């Protein structure tokens, strides 16, 4: 069996699921637009530049989850999927995932699993490696549990996940990772088939230098 790994935001989706979740909450009147959008833009700029402090960002990202009961969040998420995610789900991304049926497939994303688990199911991908929000008594605490699934943390989390299955990356004759971002270089550099998907300029330059495949799902 081969291994196929997919980044989510700006790879399988034409947008960012965490950003869209925040926009949804703003539209629900849950978050203050002016305050939240200014901070979110700062974090996004840092992400693009490869300078994001993931712990600082996650404290910001996960705080809204701790303010509302899980049953309310789940209800909002159903609306969020219909309103925000389905419109940015790339048809060509569905086709790409279908081409890997029969491989061991997983989405590997820095965005938290509350936001992304239903999206993985929408793609028909059974396995999700994501940043895990901590919870107590069934409710989110606003904290993170385990290693954030970001930069080198994506590779760390993948190694741990494979170990639970009794295998390692070397167990697969072929492995793919599809991503748009320079932040994913630590994992891209470790698979046999790194694929840059509609990449940012830095990743495109790296991919061209190392003769990696570059594709578009737009």
Give the residues covered by each predicted segment.
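Alpha-helical substrate-recognition element adjacent to the catalytic core
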Residues: 1-3, 8-132, 141
């Amino acid at each position: 069996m081969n291994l196929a790994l997919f980044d989510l935001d700006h790879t399988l989706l034409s947008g960012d699921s965490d950003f869209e979740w925040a926009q949804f909450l703003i539209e629900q009147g849950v978050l203050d637009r002016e305050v939240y959008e200014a901070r979110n833009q700062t974090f996004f700029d840092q992400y693009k530049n490869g300078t994001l402090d993931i712990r600082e960002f996650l404290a910001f990202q996960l705080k809204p989850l701790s303010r509302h009961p899980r049953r309310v969040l789940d209800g909002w998420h159903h609306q969020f999927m219909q309103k925000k995610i389905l419109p940015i789900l790339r048809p060509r991304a569905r086709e790409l995932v279908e081409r890997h049926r029969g491989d061991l497939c997983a989405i590997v994303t820095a965005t938290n699993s509350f936001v992304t688990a239903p999206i993985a199911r929408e793609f028909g991908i059974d396995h999700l490696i994501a940043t895990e929000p901590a919870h107590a008594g069934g409710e989110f605490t606003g904290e993170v549990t385990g290693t954030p699934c970001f930069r080198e943390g994506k590779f760390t989390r993948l190694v741990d996940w494979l170990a639970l299955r009794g295998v390692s990356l070397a167990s697969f004759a072929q492995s793919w990772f599809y991503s748009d971002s320079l932040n994913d270089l630590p994992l891209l550099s470790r698979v046999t088939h790194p694929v840059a998907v509609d990449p940012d300029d830095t990743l495109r330059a790296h991919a061209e230098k190392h003769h990696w495949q570059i594709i578009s799902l737009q």
